[in-house]
Amino acid sequence: MALRKTRISALATLLAATTASGNLLAEELRLITWGGYAPDEVVAQFEEETGIDVKITLSNNEDMISKLRATGGAGFDLAQPSQDRIVGVQRQFNIYKPIDYSRINTGQLQASMVNATQESTALDGQSYGVPSVWGTSGLIVHSSVADTVTDYTDLCDPAVAGKVSYRLKRPTLIGFAFAMGMDPFAAYEDRDEYQSILAKVEDKLIDCKDNVKTYWTGGDQLLSLLRTGEVTAAMAWDAGGWKLNAENPDIRFVAPESGALGWIDTFAIPRRSENEEAAYKWINFVMQPEIAAKITNASGNFTASKGADEFVNAELRDAYRLSFDEEAINNIKWYPPVPPGLEAMEGQVLDRVQAAN
C-alpha cells in the first residue's frame, strides 16, 4: 500500500510539473495592432528573450473597437488604438482597463508624448494609454520656397501662387486656426467658440483659393505633384515628406512655426486581458531605443522611444532630425478626442470652401 501511495504521489508530482511546464511553454500574448508595428524580427527577439509566444492580428481603429466591443474587452491582451479613439469608446463600451504606469519604463519614453497621451486618454482620473508610434501633419516644401513657407497660412503667400496643395479635411482647418493665433482644441467643448473659429478659417481658405493648384485627395497624387514641381508647397504628412527627401534633398518636411499636428497610436490593455503581465513586458521591450528603431524602419513612422532615432536607417534619421528638433517636438499639437457634432460643423465649412468661387 505504501509503495502504491508513493507511486501515485510521484505520478501526481510528474503530472503537475508537466502541466506547469506546458503552461509556461504555451504562454501567449495576443496583440491586435497596425501593419508594421510588430515586425517579424522584433517578435522573434521578444519570443526568444521571454519565452512568450506572440499572436498578431492586424487591424485599424474601427476594427479594434468592433472586435473588443463584441467581446466586452476579451480576445486580446494588448491593443494599439489611436489616442483620440480611447476615451469616448471607453466611456461608452468599457472595453479597456486603466494603465498602471508604475509598470511602464517611462524613462525610455519622450516625456511630452507621455504627458499628451496621459491627458488625452484620461477618464475619471485614470489614463488608458501609453504612447507608441506617432506621426504628424505639417508642410512639405521645395527648397526654393522654404524661406517663405514656414507656417500653414504661408500657403496663401503670393510667392507660391498656383503651386499649393492641401486637403479639404479637418487637419487643414485645425492647422490654419493655430497659424492664425487661435486654439481650436481648447474650443472643442464650446460649440459657439469653435464655430467662431471655423468662420474665420473659412474666410481665410476662401481667400486662399487662387493659390491652390488642387486639393489633394490621395497621398500618391500629392507626391507626384511635388515630384514634378507642379506643387512646391503643401500641407501633408511627415512620412510622405521624408520619402520625397530620400529621392530629392531639395524637398523636405517642415514642422510649422505654430506646431505640427500630431497623432499617437498607443498601447491599451483590453478589460478582459488574460495575460496583462506579458502585455507590459511587450510594451517595455519594444520601446527600448534599439528595438523601437526597428519598428520605425518597418513602418516609416517614428516611435515615442527616447533616443531611437540614433538607430534608424540613416536617410530616415537625417530627414527626421531636419524636421524635428526638441523644440519642434514639444510644440506638436496633439489631437484630442473629438466631441460629438464637430465633424458635421467642419463638413459644412469645407463644403462651402469647396463651392466658393
Language-model segments: what does each one mean?
Residues 326-357:
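Conserved C-terminal helix/tail region of periplasmic/extracytoplasmic solute-binding proteins
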Residues 85-88, 233-250:
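A ligand-binding cleft/hinge motif common to bilobed small-molecule-binding domains
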Residues 80-223:
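Extracytoplasmic ligand-binding site segments that recognize negatively charged/polar headgroups
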Residues 27-89:
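Early extracytoplasmic/lumenal segment of secretory-pathway proteins
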Residues 138-145, 177-179, 264-275, 294-295:
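A bilobed periplasmic-binding-protein/Venus flytrap-type ligand-binding module shared by bacterial periplasmic
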Residues 261, 270-330:
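Mature extracytoplasmic/periplasmic domains
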Residues 198-208, 247-271:
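Periplasmic-binding protein-like
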Residues 17-21:
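N-terminal signal peptide c-region/cleavage motif recognized by signal peptidases
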